[in-house]
Regions:
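Charged helix-capping and loop-helix junction motifs
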Residues: 187-197, 234-235
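Conserved SGNH/GDSL esterase-like catalytic core that processes O-acyl groups on lipids
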Residues: 100-192
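N-terminal secretory targeting modules
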Residues: 1-109, 118, 122-123
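Catalytic His-Asp segment of secreted/periplasmic serine-dependent ester chemistry enzymes
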Residues: 218-290
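Alpha/beta-hydrolase-fold catalytic nucleophile elbow
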Residues: 175, 213-214
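Active-site-proximal loop/turn and secondary-structure-junction residues that shape catalytic pockets
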Residues: 180, 216-219
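A short helix->loop->beta-strand "cap" motif at the edges of active sites that frequently abuts
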Residues: 205-209
């Protein structure tokens, strides 16, 4: 009997020792987890700016809602000037440098995304009618972001992103903005939509080289009927577009090199009567630049 009691005592002792060790380990793990959570809270980084994400807009904004979207300006990049001074982003200096000319046939598999200015490139024989186009009168970046159904020049309808996603072009040229910049004042919503549009396109077309084209110059008299379309403001906006393009790993093209006169206005011989759109005679200069 004594041997049995001794044996039972030893078994219970081992059992309690195992239970004690297990409990101690559990307590230690809980303490370590608590310390880890506390450390993360004390050292966590600021939350990223969700305004730059590609999915915050799921419905189309119209009317008074247009200017309610916040915008954080693209990072300011410094560039070297001829007098060795440093200045903020200048779209003229940020533009893609010239490269050897290519044949028109090279544009047969590229796509253009734009508004009525780009429609001219599609319609006029002096443009690039052999290319593919997503060009719609009155279009702007929000149309692309919100998946709006757009009307083509031939009367058909389509959703721009659906067409581009199905097409997967090797190269895409974008020119959008004139239609929403008519009014003077804040243009932050336009830039926000432009950022979102580039994010969406880059995600949908991972193998496509994207070229962001500058807002085109206009004639000086345009300001009387369209207060937001004047040289100084368009230069400011193009500076922002150039910074956004570089930030998004897109190339930036300065169309003013091909279309503007020495004063920075749309060349008179290229201008339609409205001072904004381009005559057929102006498209060869645009094509040559591309």
């Amino acid at each position: 009997m004594a041997d049995y009691q001794e044996y039972r005592r030893r078994i219970l002792h081992r059992r309690w020792r195992r239970m004690f060790i297990t409990a101690a380990l559990l307590i230690l793990l809980v303490l370590l987890a608590a310390v880890g959570v506390l450390w993360k809270r004390l050292h966590r980084e600021p939350a990223p700016n969700t305004a730059q994400g590609p999915t915050i807009l799921q419905q189309e904004l119209t009317g008074s809602e247009w200017n309610t979207i916040s915008y954080t300006p693209a990072r300011r990049l410094s560039v070297q000037t001829l007098d060795n001074g440093m200045t903020a982003m200048d779209f003229r200096l940020a533009a893609q440098p010239a490269s050897p000319a290519v044949e028109r046939s090279s544009f047969s598999d590229v796509s253009f995304l734009g508004d009525s200015l780009t429609q001219g490139m599609q319609i006029y024989s002096s443009g690039l009618p052999e290319a593919s186009f997503c060009a719609y009168r009155g279009a702007n970046p929000s149309v692309v972001v919100n998946g709006t159904t757009c009307k083509r020049s031939d009367g058909g309808t389509e959703v721009p992103m659906e067409v581009l996603t199905a097409r997967q072009p090797p190269v895409l040229y974008i020119l959008l903005g004139t239609n929403v910049l008519n009014r003077d004042g804040d243009y932050s919503s336009f830039l926000t939509y432009y950022r979102l549009m580039l994010d969406m396109i880059s995600q949908a077309l991972p193998n496509t080289q994207i070229y962001v084209q500058s807002i085109t110059p206009v004639r000086p008299e345009v300001r009387s009927s369209h207060p937001g379309l004047y040289k100084e403001r368009l230069c400011e906006i193009n500076n922002e577009l150039a910074a956004i393009a570089l930030e998004k790993n897109c190339a930036f093209l300065n169309l003013w090199e091909a279309l503007a006169d020495d004063n920075g206005d749309l060349k008179a011989e290229y201008a339609q009567p409205d001072g904004i759109h381009i005559k057929p005679e102006g498209y060869p200069a645009w094509v040559e630049y591309l």
